[in-house]
Amino acid sequence: YSSYCRLWIHVEGDKEPAYYGVYEMIEAIDDKYVKRRKDLFGDHKHNLWKCRWGATLNYNDIHGANIYYDDDSGANYTYELESNTDNFETAKAQLIEFTKNLTQRQGDDFHDWIASVCDVRLLLRTYAVNVAVGMWDDYWNNCNNYYIYFNSSDRDNYKFFFIPYDYDNTLGT
């Protein structure tokens, strides 16, 4: 989430605080973000992925994708594991299996699977908000600027959450 604030800095000895302008405050999406929402997510200790440009969630594309964990190197990866990095290989296998199911299941099989791993209403509401605000730099337009969270490390038994971010250009900041 983001908001704006007016920043004044009070320097000891000065008569009035100094006004520094309007700044954007952005809540980081990290393990603390997930922990603050553990009632929604059902857990806060599992796999949070940052997904950048090219993160299609398509099983046919993921094998050539740049999948790594946050190593503080400053490198940008298509899919970057932000939490639970000690279990990277397990998290990566879960992500790949998720994309396989998302891409290859069809009909009632897909319907039953997606309903079991995702709050479909919440996902559709998220998409509707992105459309309503004209979000042009997101998953649905550029396969970009979103996080996904799996509330379990189990390859088949989890809930998936889609977390969009980076609305600054869309909202005119």
Residue ranges, per PLM feature:
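Phosphate/dinucleotide-binding and metal-coordinating scaffold of catalytic cores
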Residues: 1-173
